[in-house]
A protein has these predicted regions:
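Thiamine diphosphate
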Residues: 14-178, 183-185, 189-190
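Short, mixed-charge aromatic SLiMs
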Residues: 6-10, 14-15, 82-88, 225-230
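Active-site/ligand-binding-proximal alpha/beta "capping" segment
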Residues: 183-205
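Flexible, low-complexity linker and terminal segments
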Residues: 37-47, 51-61, 69, 199, ...
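Flexible loop/turn segments at secondary-structure boundaries
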Residues: 82-86, 108-111, 132-135, 157-161, ...
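Single conserved hydrophobic/aromatic residue that forms the stacking wall/gate
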Residues: 2-9, 13, 359-365
């Protein structure tokens, strides 16, 4: 019995030394971070939150816009990564009166969307860089016919097929300049997944108020990414009137290019409305009357009017918000989904007492 107790003590000591050595060797060789991170509670504004991705936020923004304007929504497009989920999501909302059409190609998609706008619905289409390139001719048609149209570019890596599953903010110049002739149109970009809601809503409002196509820039990071999102109160969203031209019951000729003095937008005349027959199409029209006109002076005037109409949108934008120092040595300009990275970098540099500021170009919410 005495020897048995001694052996047990020796075995206990041996096993304890083995455990000590094993633990020491593991700790000495394992690549374990020694820094401790404490995630503080987020400072969130009061309200009801849900988790949302950019795709759903975009679709909800479109739906809110047509509800507030009493319009119908017609989405026509062609599947392309990473924009396809917008079509998939909207196709499940027939109960809200949403019409979706999967076209045979990108050109047919935007053509159907523009045709829907011509018929009195709000036409929307979506694609990515290669598809937007194919839609260029119809974008020009939307500019010259002055019809409302929302085009969503969910950017990906390019050029050509490029990197379909990777994110890249490389389509800005394509969005601003990618049409033949003088064909300006508003281009706005979402900053976060939740911001896609407000950006989509604002794109619809601009398109209807100013009778113009509007390009909304998103990207794969935004539509697939998620964030906590405070559910907005629809009653606080501004209504906007579609402004359809009413019947012309007089003997006077309808003037399709007679414009709103404030916005320079022409009237939205629905086909089949009595007394509103007029010419429409891709050939230049005469100011006010809408007759076909090849005169150089008239063409210059129409080009300038269309450009000024888009420029007038800036009059309703609030002052630019500056994050950081009001005056400093460096100003960082950012747009789109770089918002989070640029803001975090600015905060870090400000803590090092560097005098710099950040302006993120985005649509105000």
């Amino acid at each position: 019995p005495h020897n048995s107790g001694r052996r047990q003590r020796q075995m206990c000591i041996r096993d304890s030394i083995r455990a000590l050595n094993t633990g020491y060797n593991y700790g000495d060789t394992a690549e374990i971070f020694t820094t401790r991170y404490v995630v503080k509670k987020a400072k969130l504004a009061p309200g009801k939150y849900r988790n949302i991705n950019g795709t759903l936020a975009t679709c909800l923004g479109l739906l809110t816009a047509v509800e507030k304007s009493k319009l119908s929504l017609t989405f026509a497009g062609y599947p392309i990564t990473p924009a396809s989920n917008i079509l998939h999501t909207l196709s499940n909302w027939k109960r809200f009166g949403v019409k979706t059409y999967q076209a045979e190609d990108e050109i047919a998609g935007i053509g159907a969307a523009l045709g829907a706008s011509y018929g009195g619905s709000l036409g929307v289409t979506a694609s990515s860089g290669p598809g937007i390139a194919l839609k260029g001719e119809f974008l020009g048609l939307a500019v010259i016919t002055e019809l409302p149209l929302v085009v969503i570019n969910v950017q990906r890596g390019g050029p050509s097929t490029g990197l379909p599953t990777k994110t890249e903010q490389s389509d800005l110049f394509q969005a601003v300049y990618g049409r033949n002739g003088e064909a300006p149109m508003p281009v706005i970009a979402a900053a976060t997944p939740g911001d896609c809601y407000y950006t989509a809503y604002e794109a619809c409002r601009m398109a209807v108020k100013y009778m113009t196509p509007v390009m909304m820039l998103s990207d794969g990071y935004l539509v697939n990414g998620s964030e906590p999102w405070i559910i907005p109160n629809p009653d606080k969203m501004n209504d906007f009137d579609a402004g359809f031209v009413k019947e012309n019951l007089t003997d006077e000729q309808y003037l399709p290019y007679k414009r709103n003095e404030e916005t320079l937008a022409r009237g939205w005349a629905i086909p089949g409305t009595k007394g509103l027959e007029h010419r429409i199409g891709g050939i230049e029209k005469q100011d006010v009357t809408g007759n076909v006109n090849y005169d150089s002076d008239n063409h210059e005037k129409m080009v300038q009017i269309r450009a000024q109409k888009v420029a007038n949108i800036a009059n309703e934008l609030p002052p630019t918000e500056i994050f950081g120092e009001k005056k400093g040595d460096l100003l960082i300009l950012s747009w789109g989904s770089t918002h989070g990275a640029c803001k975090a970098a600015t905060e870090s540099l400000l803590e090092e007492d560097l005098k710099l500021s950040l302006i993120h170009i985005s649509e105000p919410t």
